[in-house]
Curated annotation (Swiss-Prot):
InterPro entries, alphabetized: Aldolase_TIM, FBA_I, FBA_I_Gram+-type
SUPFAM superfamilies per UniProt: Aldolase
Catalytic activity: beta-D-fructose 1,6-bisphosphate = D-glyceraldehyde 3-phosphate + dihydroxyacetone phosphate
Keywords: Glycolysis, Lyase, Schiff base
Name used for this protein in its record: Fructose-bisphosphate aldolase class 1
Transmembrane regions listed in the UniProt entry: none
Source lineage: Bacteria, Fusobacteriati, Fusobacteriota, Fusobacteriia, Fusobacteriales
Gene Ontology molecular function: fructose-bisphosphate aldolase activity
Active site positions: E176, K213
UniProt-listed Enzyme Commission number(s): 4.1.2.13
Class in the EC hierarchy, top level: lyase
Gene Ontology biological-process annotations: glycolytic process
Record pathway: Carbohydrate degradation; glycolysis; D-glyceraldehyde 3-phosphate and glycerone phosphate from D-glucose: step 4/4
Top-rank lineage group of the source organism: Bacteria
Length: 295
């Protein structure tokens, strides 16, 4: 664990988010050039997305020189690449740290303009399996659409409550309270969020290490203090609907923050490409995101 923690804390590179779940899979496949008439049920759909993820992970461009970690969906964790479970393949063949998406999706938007995470009664069992599958860390997402101090406080409190369970299971949690980039009051949301996160970080015991995954902030370096916080392993950014070019541009202006992009990583990849075209496109995408992460 120490070698892995050291890599995550100080390594150069970014985190590839490959954790599209049931809701976002059809969209991800469509962007990849696989239409909905090409599969007739969930199993076929997940087989196709696993093929896409396998193609990305096995690509020569996908390696530890630029990529520190990869976030997986539960079904991907239980699937294999060349006879090895995905997490083992990532670490043993690529020296890339495997993370697992552990949330069960979002509750509906509430009166405070936030979406907390759905209840997760089987979390303890999932964390046990994650350990058996050699997962390094976890990720869970909530969404903030309004500058409501009460709503944002609840989002952050829930995130840190679940993070404590993850830490107790011996894993590193990525706390992801996403601020919707279309918020009219995005700046206020982000300031309230920063203050809430600071409060919770300062209350963590010394044995707790967490990561933060945050929307690229409107105010440059808003989260810089967290990159130096003793309880924070790394601060990563989500692309949140910005184009890759725009996301990379904003990211490069935020010191100490690295990318954890999903859609921005796979932009331009297609099932119809030859391996040579696919690898070339992926390499260019990885290079751009890497440069913005290490700036």
């Amino acid at each position: 664990m120490n070698e892995k923690l050291e890599k995550m804390r100080n390594g150069k590179g970014f985190i590839a988010a490959l954790d599209q779940s049931g809701g976002s899979t059809p969209k991800a496949l469509k962007l990849y050039g696989v239409n909905e008439n090409e599969y007739s049920n969930d199993k076929e759909m997940f087989d196709l997305i696993h093929k896409m993820r396998t193609r990305i992970i096995k690509s020569p461009a996908f390696n530890e020189s630029k990529i520190l970690g990869a976030i997986l969906f539960e079904q991907t964790m239980d699937s294999k690449i060349d006879g090895k479970y995905t997490a083992d393949f990532l670490w043993e063949e690529k020296k890339v740290l495997p993370f697992l998406k552990i949330d069960k999706g979002l509750n509906d938007l509430d009166a405070d303009g936030v979406q907390t995470m759905k209840p997760n009664p089987t979390l303890a069992d999932l964390l046990k399996r994650a350990n058996e599958r050699h997962i390094f860390g976890t990720k869970m997402r909530s969404v903030i659409k309004k500058a409501s101090p009460a709503g944002i406080a609840r989002v952050v409190e829930q995130q840190f409550e679940v993070a404590a369970q993850v830490v107790a299971a011996g894993l590193i949690p990525i706390i992801e309270p996403e601020v919707d980039i279309n918020n009219v009051d995005k700046v206020q949301c982000e300031e309230i969020l920063r203050d809430e996160i600071r409060k919770h970080l300062n209350a963590l015991p010394e044995t707790s290490n967490v990561m933060l995954k945050l929307t690229l902030p409107t105010v440059e370096n808003l989260y810089e203090e967290f990159t130096k916080h003793p309880r924070v392993v790394r601060v990563v950014a989500l692309s949140g609907g910005y184009s890759r070019e725009k996301a990379n541009d904003i990211l490069s202006k935020n010191k100490g923050v690295i990318a954890s992009f999903s859609r921005a990583l796979t932009e331009g990849l297609s099932a119809q490409q030859t391996d040579e075209e696919f690898n070339k496109t992926l390499a260019a995408s990885i290079d751009g995101i890497y440069e913005a992460s290490v700036k």
